């Protein structure tokens, strides 16, 4: 299915005019949405639990409240807390304070699509999902453009939900560079698949496997790190800028020939079948339930996975090598530390 890119000129209704907006959560996405909307002339308050994020929101000049108080005051409530805590936050502090005609928004469809959160039928449910981390959403807005976004409507109680979604996307700067309409189902399942099979899970597993093959064959770990991890950014940047074509035009003929000959030997039809199994677990809710149940149990699986990952040899080798490369990791100031 082909979708049409939309821009600021396509946002016909200033649906957020006169609305009080509550951004719930002040982390990576929360600070970016809130600051961009404020700079776009919107009336924004913050709802967040006491702690560092609460203090940071006040320091950044926002009227800051508890989640319950912010919900009571607002017409439009955007929930930007981490996926795993949204259900309990919604049930305890947001749901009791919603009114008919309110709009509730999300930047990811996880809790709505898998029905961990059920919003009353007289409340709009929309989505604005920028395709980039919060610090990039903020930085590009300040530079005069933005990050593309997906928007969707799950529930249109007032007849105005799509206008709210599009105007929100405009307010955070996304409509400057392009909007794509989607559904909660499509955004949620595709986003999770991309993260698990390619961008995060697939990529890190591929890098680690390559590192192990080289070191087990007797090659120096430091050299293996450069070959399978450090140079990854250089290749990905070329693909990002101009697709596979630009990457292949930029590498040597030797590398290009090896790409065609050996790539299919690594990513086989069996790997594709494994990817289909990953997608199936996303579609049928197995992954979502496993993730939420692990959180409710105190995160034993996630904690174990993190400990295992931290002890990988490639991580230890990389940490030492990066000390000699002060230019690595200096591209986006310290926004990650501030808002995470």
Swiss-Prot record:
Binding site for substrate: 252
Positions contributing to Mg(2+) 2 binding: 191, 227, 231
GO terms, molecular function: ketol-acid reductoisomerase activity; magnesium ion binding; NADP binding
Annotated metabolic or biological route of this protein: Amino-acid biosynthesis; L-isoleucine biosynthesis; L-isoleucine from 2-oxobutanoate: step 2/4; Amino-acid biosynthesis; L-valine biosynthesis; L-valine from pyruvate: step 2/4
Pfam families registered for this protein in UniProt: KARI_C (PF01450), KARI_N (PF07991)
BP terms from Gene Ontology: isoleucine biosynthetic process; L-valine biosynthetic process
Keywords tagged on the record: Amino-acid biosynthesis, Branched-chain amino acid biosynthesis, Magnesium, Metal-binding, NADP, Oxidoreductase
Amino acids binding NADP(+): 26-29, 49, 53, 83-86, 134
This enzyme's EC code(s): 1.1.1.86
Annotated KARI C-terminal knotted domain residues: 183-328
Sequence ranges assigned to domain KARI N-terminal Rossmann in this UniProt record: 3-182
GO CC, any one term: cytosol
Transmembrane segments: none
Protein biosynthesis found in the keyword field: no
Catalytic activity: (2R)-2,3-dihydroxy-3-methylbutanoate + NADP(+) = (2S)-2-acetolactate + NADPH + H(+); (2R,3R)-2,3-dihydroxy-3-methylpentanoate + NADP(+) = (S)-2-ethyl-2-hydroxy-3-oxobutanoate + NADPH + H(+)
Active site (record annotation): 108
Domain of life: Bacteria
PROSITE patterns, sorted: KARI_C, KARI_N
Signal peptide: none
Note on cofactor: Binds 2 magnesium ions per subunit.
Binding sites annotated in the UniProt record for Mg(2+) 1: 191, 195
Cofactor(s) it depends on: Mg(2+)
NCBIfam families with a match to the protein in the record: ilvC, PRK05479.1, PRK13403.1
Family that this chain belongs to: Belongs to the ketol-acid reductoisomerase family.
Job of this protein: Involved in the biosynthesis of branched-chain amino acids (BCAA). Catalyzes an alkyl-migration followed by a ketol-acid reduction of (S)-2-acetolactate (S2AL) to yield (R)-2,3-dihydroxy-isovalerate. In the isomerase reaction, S2AL is rearranged via a Mg-dependent methyl migration to produce 3-hydroxy-3-methyl-2-ketobutyrate (HMKB). In the reductase reaction, this 2-ketoacid undergoes a metal-dependent reduction by NADPH to yield (R)-2,3-dihydroxy-isovalerate.
Protein name: Ketol-acid reductoisomerase (NADP(+))
